[in-house]
Amino acid sequence: MKVESVVKEETKKPERKIKLAIAKPEDYSNKNVILEKEEELICPVCGSKSIIKDYERAEIVCEMCGCVLQQNLFDVGPEWRAFDHEQRVKRSRVGAPMTYTIHDKGLSTVIDWRNKDSYGKDISADKRAQLYRLRKWQRRIRVSDASERNLAFALSELDRIASKLGLPRNVRENAAVLYRGAVEKGLIRGRSIEGVAAAALYAACRRCKVPRTLDEIAEVSRVDRKEIGRTYRFISRELNIRLAPTNPVDYVPRFASELKLPGEVESKAISILQKAGEKGLTSSRGPTGVAAAAIYIASVLQGTRRTQREVADVAGVTEVTIRNRYKELTEHLDIDVTL
């Protein structure tokens, strides 16, 4: 009995160690696959971590004792080499990467709406009728039930709002993930799809430090500011999203760009806001108003002055707000501004 138990332990031990070099079954149909990123392997015989991959023999071998950990492997990587992103895109023969901004994550296909063949020639009437039927069934296959139909509508609405606001790709992906999380937890029931989509986009903007105000999102969406704010607080609580208060510094690059101010003004405004933050002048105040006042002060100091009306229009605040924040910053930071 003792001999059998020892033999079992010795046979199990190599399997547990070798398993690290094998692809997961859900990732590949064949287990004998060479992975580009592997966990650190340990030789089951000598305990060495010096493991090499022999591509000519298709084996994973211990460099110290020569033990073959795995053999008859298949390399799933490309046969070509690329030295920059442009070459990689040009030589790649696969489709677009998976994205959360499409209801089916971009894994389905779409039939082109133009009635032309691969050579650009018009197709016959019979083929045109056949293509019409194929397109109709393809649309039905892509959106099979009510939940997918609602998700497709919500993600298209989210993409529309993001396009109006000029938001980057990472913000859209983040917002789509948040919306999908809300759907999985059943947070959509009793609320409008547009409201949850706008709230998810607002949360994604704050998370990715590309801030947009509730007023800006409400202006391009079909939902008012109050509903977006209420829905945002609800999904933040239910999805356990903890976001720090918006930093006024995050607004400076966008405001400075819209006002066509040079980089020196932007740097000066950021410096003013950092000093104001150290003295607690930015807390319990609207970040857009503080950022607008800092930009106004910096533009005057750098000799590229913009009027309070111009800054207020870009920041979406009133001139009174800028004057109040301007007085606080100049008094507490001892900034001498000559108007």
Swiss-Prot record:
Family recorded in the similarity comment: Belongs to the TFIIB family.
NCBIfam families in alphabetical order: PRK00423.1
InterPro entries: Cyclin-like_dom, Cyclin-like_sf, TFIIB, TFIIB_arc, TFIIB_CS, TFIIB_cyclin, Znf_TFIIB
Residues given in the record as Zn(2+) binding sites: 43, 46, 62, 65
The protein's role, per its UniProt record: Stabilizes TBP binding to an archaeal box-A promoter. Also responsible for recruiting RNA polymerase II to the pre-initiation complex (DNA-TBP-TFIIB).
Protein name: Transcription initiation factor IIB
Species, as recorded: Methanococcus maripaludis (strain C5 / ATCC BAA-1333)
Keywords from the UniProt entry: Metal-binding, Repeat, Transcription, Transcription regulation, Zinc, Zinc-finger
PROSITE patterns documented for this protein: TFIIB, ZF_TFIIB
Swiss-Prot/TrEMBL Sequence repeat ranges: 156-239, 250-331
